[in-house]
């Protein structure tokens, strides 16, 4: 059983998020999700950003950034061109055609988050992609907005022919969650979910070369026990998908040391972000974010005011 004491911030923050999605807390609800897709290239691979939905969180010192004044957070958001009173997080899995393989990185929220998410199937259809064609799914971590789309509304496998890659530590953690604990992480009917996907799951160790020359796991600790990013492709056109190591295209990049409420280990999460921003600026690494503004592909660059997110120009 998962020890709640190891993840106090994550339990509280995600519980608050789910309450707000259910309309328990005051404030305007995020708009209903719409299907959307954006093709781009990763070297010779064809990739597609797939919109699943989006989440909004208030600037209140507890829902996302903790330990900073609301005024300080608002000032950073405003300086970065974002709304000063709330955070906007997109949800966008990534699909990649690599030779005969069709790779899907995370699966969105499925039915877990109501009508603000769960549009991955529609986005795939609009992009001309078929769930049955997906050969491999790579899970960054086991929160509802990343694994909810693994199953359909009836509990069947949404991608019946896909091997599901997830880190050994993350799989162990997910498999050990009680129903009540799982709800705090945005997961409903966790036992049924685990049972459905178990025959397809292939756990891996941190840093594993999963598909040689195509996908390599990159450990990015702090958010969940076995949180993993993925390097896709090789050479200068490769892309690093970093999961939930960063959430906000403004705050996570400009203030990576600021701690996040729903990181299981908030200090490790901050350390990971600091290193990720620093290495990305130095290397010019292309990045894919599942929560930055759609379509989530770009780089982190250094300017006179510090680091900032530079979306890739796609035509």
Residue map of PLM features:
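Active-site environment of divalent metal-dependent phosphoester hydrolases
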Residues: 35, 58, 142-149, 173, ...
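Active-site metal-binding motif and surrounding structural segment of the metallo-beta-lactamase
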Residues: 86, 90-93, 115-165
């Amino acid at each position: 059983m998962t020890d709640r004491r190891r993840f106090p911030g994550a339990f509280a923050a995600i519980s608050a998020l789910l309450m707000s999605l259910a309309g328990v807390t005051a404030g305007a609800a995020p708009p209903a999700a719409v299907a959307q897709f954006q093709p781009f290239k990763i070297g010779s691979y064809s990739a597609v950003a797939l919109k699943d939905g989006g989440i909004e969180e208030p600037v209140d010192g507890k829902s996302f950034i903790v330990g900073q004044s609301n005024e300080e957070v608002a000032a950073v958001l405003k300086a970065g061109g974002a709304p000063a009173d709330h955070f906007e997080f997109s949800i966008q899995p990534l699909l990649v055609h690599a030779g005969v393989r069709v790779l899907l990185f995370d699966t969105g929220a499925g039915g877990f988050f109501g009508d603000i998410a769960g549009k991955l199937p529609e986005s795939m259809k609009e992009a001309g992609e078929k769930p049955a064609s997906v050969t491999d799914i790579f899970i960054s971590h086991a929160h509802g907005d990343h694994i909810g789309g693994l199953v359909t509304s009836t509990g069947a496998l949404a991608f019946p022919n896909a091997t599901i890659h997830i880190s050994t530590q993350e799989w162990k953690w997910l498999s050990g969650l009680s129903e009540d604990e799982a709800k705090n992480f945005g997961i409903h009917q966790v036992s049924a979910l685990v049972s459905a996907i178990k025959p397809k799951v292939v756990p891996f160790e941190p840093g594993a070369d999963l598909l040689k020359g195509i996908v390599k796991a990159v450990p990015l600790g702090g958010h969940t026990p076995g949180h993993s990013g993925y390097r896709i492709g090789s050479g200068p056109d490769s892309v690093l998908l970093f999961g939930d190591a960063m959430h906000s295209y403004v705050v996570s990049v400009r203030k990576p040391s600021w701690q996040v409420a729903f990181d299981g280990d908030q200090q490790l999460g901050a350390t990971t972000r600091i290193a990720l921003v620093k290495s990305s600026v130095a290397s010019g690494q292309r990045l894919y974010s599942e929560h930055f503004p759609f379509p989530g592909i770009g780089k982190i660059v250094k300017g006179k005011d510090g680091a900032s997110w530079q979306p890739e120009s796609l035509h």
